[in-house]
Regions:
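Short, solvent-exposed helix-loop connector elements
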Residues: 135, 206-210, 316, 332-346, ...
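Non-catalytic, polymerase-adjacent accessory regions of viral genome-replication enzymes
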Residues: 1-70
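Duplex nucleic acid-engaging cores and interfaces of nucleic-acid transaction enzymes
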Residues: 110-118, 144, 152
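Core structural elements
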Residues: 35-40, 87-90, 98, 200, ...
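Conserved polymerase palm-domain catalytic core
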Residues: 72-75, 79-94, 98, 130-289, ...
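A glycine-rich phosphate-binding loop feature that marks nucleotide/adenosyl-phosphate handling sites
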Residues: 242-245, 281-291, 349-353, 370-378, ...
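Extended C-terminal regions of large enzymes
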Residues: 385-435
Length: 435
């Protein structure tokens, strides 16, 4: 009798339920689900929606669609089933981080993006069952805003001694043998393990290639033991991690000081176990109750301030100045590369940059930063329009706000919206939204 087919969402739910109910279970025979047409097509649609840059082979989604998506997926499945599939080298791209530093992004070819995405679709429910509630980065139904709200709550619970941790080149330094061993604790399928190893090795001798669909899942898995170790102190402490960005909050008491020191020791031990070191120059234990006490987490500067209006103390978080500089630099570069475009098309590219930035940073105490960005973005767009019309200045009298935000369509929603605390809980994702 032929077994009835099940859709991908149901398959993922079944895998997750089995992983949750039997924490020691090792999954085997799941490679067959990766090479299924439904899995590969779902991974393809996710990759296409994200529309990343081409890999080293220059292949684009437009070319694949023109030649035939069915043939592309069929050839990929054939290679995977026959064992002839080989990942292509990553294309490296450097992204400025500010202060003269850069972050290296590894861009896989589209075919490799699809295969990695298919692996993630099948492995994700296995490891999601094991992951800690303290981990928020790149996980289904979780967000940076949820992590931010938990830190805010911790500060309002008077946990004012902060362990501010900086992991040195986290993604670049993770040992392959350690991450493969962690995958192997749950997955006993040699073909999957071999594929994961191939993807790691094609990125170099160490590290997890940033920019690949598999990297967030593996990065979370690498620190999962640390998450569970610190979770044992939850209640007295607050621990929140978003990929390699983490913070520990404890009461500013004698007991709290001991717990903070021990937490830092444990973080150092777990990081060393996977080949990563702590940046001792940037990692510190500080008191928010002392003058000048502040730390950085998820792009925000956190302070404990007293309201001049009510006299109450509260967690004050504002965007890092570097984040403001960075978004304005990106807008400038976009306009510099858009001189051949029509005004509305050039503005739409700017909107794609500032909309995401504003939606992320509009929580907390960001009113000043938001208005600063709005002013300078409008100024840059006006200057761009003046140059296109071969005029000087910024056209403050020539073009009204109705023209800039109406006819040109420049994004203008820079209002602060306080985070909805009722949504801190995890929201169930759909398949296409899971990567």
């Amino acid at each position: 009798m032929t077994k009835p087919t099940i859709d991908l969402q149901e398959l993922r739910e079944r895998i997750g339920q089995r992983a949750k109910s039997t924490p020691t279970h090792k999954f085997w025979g799941v490679y067959v689900h990766i090479v299924k047409r439904t899995t590969l097509e779902a991974a393809y649609l996710i990759a296409k929606r994200q529309n990343g840059a081409p890999g080293c082979d220059g292949e684009t989604f437009a070319r694949i669609e023109e030649a035939g998506r069915d043939e592309f997926l069929r050839d990929l499945a054939t290679e995977l089933c026959s064992g002839t599939y080989q990942p292509r080298p990553y294309r490296r791209r450097e992204i400025p981080k500010g202060g003269g530093r850069v972050r290296t992004i590894s861009i896989p070819a589209i075919r490799d993006r699809v295969v990695q995405g298919a692996i993630r679709l099948i492995l994700e429910p296995i490891f999601e069952a094991d992951f800690s509630d303290s981990s928020y980065g790149a996980r289904p139904g979780r967000s940076a805003h949820q992590a931010i709200e938990l830190v805010r709550q911790g500060l309002h619970q008077r946990k004012h001694r902060v362990v501010d941790v900086d992991l040195s080149r986290y993604f670049d330094c993770i040992r392959h043998d350690r991450i493969l061993a962690k995958v192997g604790k749950r997955v006993q399928d040699k073909r999957i393990l071999a594929l994961v190893k191939q993807f790691l090795k094609s990125g170099g001798r160490r590290g997890i290639p940033q920019g690949s669909p598999l990297s967030p899942l593996l990065a979370n898995l690498a620190l999962n033991d640390l998450d569970h170790a610190l979770d044992r102190g939850q209640g007295f402490l607050t621990y929140v991690r978003y990929l390699d960005d983490m913070v520990v909050l404890v009461p500013d008491s004698e007991k709290g000081r001991r717990w903070a020191d021990r937490a830092l020791e444990r973080i150092s031990e777990e990081a060393e176990a996977i080949g990563v070191s702590i940046n001792t120059e940037k990692t510190r234990v500080l008191s928010m109750s002392e003058a000048g006490g502040k730390f950085v987490f998820l792009g925000f500067v956190w302070r404990w301030k007293r309201s001049p209006r009510t006299g109450r103390w509260y967690a004050y978080l504002s965007p890092r100045p570097e984040k403001v500089t960075e978004v304005l630099r990106r807008v400038r570069n976009s306009l510099d590369n858009s001189r051949h475009l029509r005004m509305r098309d050039a503005v739409e590219q700017v909107n794609g940059i500032v909309r995401g930035w504003a939606n992320y940073f509009r929580v907390g105490n960001a009113a000043h930063a938001l208005q600063k960005v709005k002013y300078h973005v409008e100024r840059k767009v006006r200057r761009f329009a003046a140059r296109k019309s071969k005029r000087g200045g910024f056209g403050w009298k020539r073009w009204s706000s109705e023209v800039v935000y109406g006819a040109w369509g420049l994004y203008g929603d820079y209002q602060v919206r306080y985070f909805n605390r009722a949504k801190v809980g995890v929201q169930p994702p759909g398949i296409i939204n899971s990567l």
